[in-house]
């Protein structure tokens, strides 16, 4: 059984920061695969700008041909908001170990996550740097030199931050 890094999120829209995180994860020699898993609906949000099926399609296009990256539709197929603990427990039936990847901006709310006490016992957290947020030494840290967020990108639609393979389609969806 393999060891994976679970990189979940809304990816609403996917951008160069997400790609940089995946590249950084692929360099970690103790991870066999990076599992990228879009949410059906983020548990902390009431809606997504782009529907889950479309976000899943974009991720498949972005990482097509990359043998270390697995695009997983588990959460999308649930047709509901899925908590991280539920996803991790599902993945542990298929993989030996799950590293859970989060952005440093999620650290402040981490303890409010559903069943966090259980979650922290079954995963090892990998935290991607973001802005100047301090990352506690108990977490594995990966350096990512991208400062964009999906919400900021929806506001400004900076084409240079969109993956080239699907940027036209992303622009069309978010401009409407």
Where are these regions (language model features)?
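Nucleotidyltransferase catalytic core that binds NTPs
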Residues: 1-176
């Amino acid at each position: 059984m393999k060891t994976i890094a679970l990189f979940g999120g809304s990816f609403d829209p996917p951008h160069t920061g997400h790609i940089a995180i995946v590249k950084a994860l692929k360099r970690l020699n103790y991870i066999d695969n990076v599992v990228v898993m879009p949410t059906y609906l983020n548990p902390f949000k009431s809606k997504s700008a782009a529907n889950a099926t479309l976000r899943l399609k974009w991720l498949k296009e972005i990482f097509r041909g990359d043998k270390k990256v697995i695009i997983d539709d588990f959460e999308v197929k649930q047709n509901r908001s899925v908590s991280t603990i539920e996803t991790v427990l599902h993945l542990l039936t298929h993989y030996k170990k799950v590293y859970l990847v989060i952005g440093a901006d999620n650290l402040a709310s981490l303890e409010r996550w559903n069943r966090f006490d259980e979650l922290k016992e079954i995963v090892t957290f990998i935290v991607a740097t973001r802005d100047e947020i301090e990352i506690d030494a108990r977490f594995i840290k990966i350096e990512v030199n991208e400062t964009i967020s999906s919400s900021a990108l929806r506001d400004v639609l900076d084409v240079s931050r969109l993956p080239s393979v699907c940027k036209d389609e992303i622009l069309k969806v978010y401009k409407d």
